[in-house]
């Protein structure tokens, strides 16, 4: 079994009440030889957030729905994990939610990514499609795995690899929250980072719902006529992404991750 590069620290986000989830993840990670640090997830059901952490006005405008306590908990749990990473002094962090499932190549892929760390700042798993409009392979890895730049990315936050540059930029700019974390994290231009996805995906999602981010989904969307602002926000975000997309296609100067 290939060992994980020691420059990578692994964080697993898990709610205190999700003990079965933790046990299942322990087995999955043990099977591929990965040790981890558990991050006690912020439970949005009970957490009292501040205005510095969450902007309700912008959330309603950009998401078109009432506040979701689960989404707030998820967002702040990832923020907490990034803070722990920065304090760790490590070069890279793999951040996981407790519903991620890994294939047998996962550790080898992580080690390969470290060996080409000059190329990326943030790598998402299970978010790219092979070919198709807007999905461009920018670098081969091994056995058909490739890094992709995606003009129209899938939102996904269950597994991603970041370096210290990305972590510090995210930590400085993530708050206050006004969209779910998996929607915010794709804004590579805002954080000045090189962000890619991998195909074929080495990570999938367990079919059962994760506790992380799901609590509060009973919050209903507003009627259509109150959601027009959501359309404008999404169009604007895609335009900005399209304008900056070329940056992901340029070959970077070699640098240490």
Each predicted region: which residue ranges?
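An acidic/histidine-cluster motif and surrounding catalytic segment
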Residues: 1-96, 100-257
């Amino acid at each position: 079994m290939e060992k994980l590069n020691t420059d990578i620290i692994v964080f697993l986000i898990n709610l205190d009440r999700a003990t079965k989830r933790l046990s299942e993840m322990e087995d999955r990670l043990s099977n591929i030889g990965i040790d981890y640090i558990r991050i006690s997830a912020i439970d949005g059901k009970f957490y009292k957030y501040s205005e510095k952490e969450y902007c309700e006005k912008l959330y309603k405008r950009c998401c078109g729905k009432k506040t979701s306590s689960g989404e707030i908990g998820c967002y702040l749990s990832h923020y907490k994990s990034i803070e722990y990473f920065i304090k760790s002094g490590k070069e890279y962090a793999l951040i996981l939610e407790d519903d991620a499932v890994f294939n047998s190549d996962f550790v080898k892929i992580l080690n390969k990514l470290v060996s080409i760390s000059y190329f990326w700042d943030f790598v998402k798993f299970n978010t790219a499609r092979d070919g198709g409009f807007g999905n461009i392979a920018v670098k081969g890895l091994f056995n058909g795995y490739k890094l992709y730049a995606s003009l129209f990315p899938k939102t996904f936050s269950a597994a991603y690899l970041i370096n210290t540059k990305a972590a510090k930029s995210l930590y400085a700019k993530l708050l206050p929250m006004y969209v779910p974390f998996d929607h915010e994290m794709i804004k590579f231009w805002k954080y000045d980072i090189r962000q890619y996805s991998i195909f074929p995906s080495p990570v999938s999602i367990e079919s059962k719902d994760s506790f992380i981010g799901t609590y509060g989904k009973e919050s209903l969307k507003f009627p259509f006529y109150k959601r027009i602002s959501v359309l404008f926000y999404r169009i604007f975000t895609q335009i900005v992404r399209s304008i900056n997309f070329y940056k992901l296609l340029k070959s970077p100067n070699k640098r240490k991750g």
